[in-house]
Amino acid sequence: MHAADMDALLFMSEREFTYFAGFQSNFWQSPTRPWFLILPAEGKPIAVIPSIGKNALSISWIDDVRIWTSPNPEDEGISLLSDTLKGLSKRHGRVGVPMGSETHLRMPANDVVKLKSALGHVDMVDATAILRNLRMVKSDWEIAKHKYICRLVSDAYENFGNIAKSGMSEREILAAHRLDVLSRGADSVPYIVATAAQDGTDDAIRFPNDRPLVDGDVLFIDTGAEIDG
């Protein structure tokens, strides 16, 4: 951050919030309220969140939590966020935000415009490279978690022959496989696909259907499971 002349990094997506704050919640399924996490170039992280998340975030390691009363459609945290960022951006006047591939800003486009206007001479600049380079280096703890979840799903695949039978539908097979993965210790299975067709399938993304599998079908299944975020 110092080399890139950035006073702070601003995150607002579930992945970055979970990675840096260690906080997990199904509340991310609701797009009505944004959550913001700021990493200053110096000092502890700062969370700027709606009031509904105050108690839940208190169990994380983030101890500087600033809240606004929400819902408040006219100002969902923009004033509080801009004031916080301006207070941190007195040296370079630059705040880094992931803007590159595989990133997104989890806030209304109108609020992005409002935030940039409220920041005045503080510029929002792309911090994708900083984030990507950081996450490319895995700690021993992260590697252990990857090994654990990969082994868990591999064991579920080994057991797949005991689950998938001719006459079952893609939907039934998918549900049984998901339950098997969860029963082995996964926290969630947010991505799972099962498609089948005679002599193979060229569709690897659609929802499962209710057609019973018959002899000659080739079943494709893809599983994305999580443990500790």
Region roles according to the model:
Residues 1-152:
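A composition/biophysics-driven feature that prefers long, compositionally simple stretches
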Residues 17-29, 126-133, 137, 168-229:
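Short catalytic-site patches enriched in acidic/histidine residues
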Residues 150-160, 170:
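Active-site pocket-lining segments that scaffold enzyme catalytic pockets across diverse folds
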Residues 4, 156, 180-184:
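Short alpha-helical functional segments enriched in proximate histidine and acidic residues
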